[in-house]
Swiss-Prot record:
It comes from the Eukaryota. Residues 1-17 form the signal peptide. One of its GO terms (cellular component) is extracellular region. Belongs to the FAM180 family. The keyword Secreted applies. The lineage of its organism: Eukaryota, Metazoa, Chordata, Craniata, Vertebrata. It is found in: Secreted. It holds the Pfam family FAM180. Its main location: secreted. Keywords: Secreted, Signal. This is Protein FAM180A. The keyword Secreted applies.
Length: 173
């Protein structure tokens, strides 16, 4: 009887472990994996696939960004905004990254309990969320500024923790 229970527990543990690793990507940014039916958004869009695209993403973040009252992000520089990657940037910023305090706190909590290091696309989206949170912190006043600042710090700590883990030798992704 005890060996049957042990076997059942081992099977359960194995199933639980394999399910956690398989679905951990979708947990952090669910909007990337569930585009709206009416939109032509790509499934799981990624901005950086080469060094040139990383540099372009950096240029997008350094360019003057505009956030409309309905929280849509756009690039003010017309030349940069006309690039194909700028369209992907707008897609990720406007449809994938969280923009409300509860959603950002949920992301921070998920990041703090995330096993292993972040995948490239999750790291990228977390950095964009951090940039958005920094922008909102700068525009806020009083109690709202404190709330945005707390979210900013928690995202920064999660990213720093991920970078520390990824720099250690022998850490699995």
């Amino acid at each position: 009887m005890h060996w049957k229970m042990l076997l059942l527990l081992l099977l359960y543990y194995n199933a639980e472990a394999s399910m956690c690793h398989r679905w951990s990507r979708a947990v952090l940014f669910p909007a990337a994996h569930r585009p709206k039916r009416s939109s032509s958004l790509p499934l799981n869009p990624v901005l950086q696939t080469s060094l040139e695209e990383v540099e372009l993403l950096y240029e997008f973040l350094l360019a003057e960004l505009e956030i409309s009252p309905d929280l849509q992000i756009s690039i003010k520089d017309e030349e940069l905004a006309s690039l194909r990657k700028a369209s992907d940037f707008r897609t990720v910023c406007n449809n994938v990254i969280p923009k409300s305090i509860p959603d950002i706190r949920r992301l921070s909590a998920s990041l703090s309990s995330h096993p292993g290091i972040l995948k490239k696309e999750d790291f990228e989206r977390t950095v964009l969320t951090l940039a958005y949170t920094a922008y909102r912190t700068a525009l806020s006043h009083g109690h709202q500024k404190d709330i945005w600042a707390q979210s900013l710090v928690s995202l920064f700590q999660a990213l720093r923790h991920d970078l520390m883990r990824s720099s250690q030798p022998g850490v699995p992704p």
